[in-house]
Amino acid sequence: RCITFGRCIKAGRCIEAGWGIKAGRGIEAGWGIEAGWGIEAGEGIKAGLGIEAGEGIEAGWGIEAGLGIEAGGGIEAGWGIEAGWGIEAGWGIKAGFQITCLLDITVRLRIFAGVCTWRLPSEEETKITCRIVKSGTVAFGLVVKA
């Protein structure tokens, strides 16, 4: 079912749950993080390999994966989002700062980068760096080819 923890969840290899994963602070795995439903952290989410959720992925700080990030719903981070490969969201992507990946970004709806509300982001912090935005509309942010 769900993994819920008041502070941090940290694993040398994988974190996997049939339903959801939720931590009051951060979630970190040396390999991958996978949940049948959603993944939520009050602070950051970091995986040496991929991050995958049947529904949404949400972090108060940043989201970082050595490989890809995939969510059936939306992906949201208070800071930036970074993936070694591609990023795929069933709905949209919203990041307080930049979104970066080496391959493609695929979403059904909209993409927002650099929408932090507590200060004005620099031009660098509004960049969406990828090979190509395959689908979806860039509502806010500057697309830069990886």
Task: Give names to the regions the model predicted.
Residues 1-146:
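Long, distal/terminal scaffolding or interaction modules
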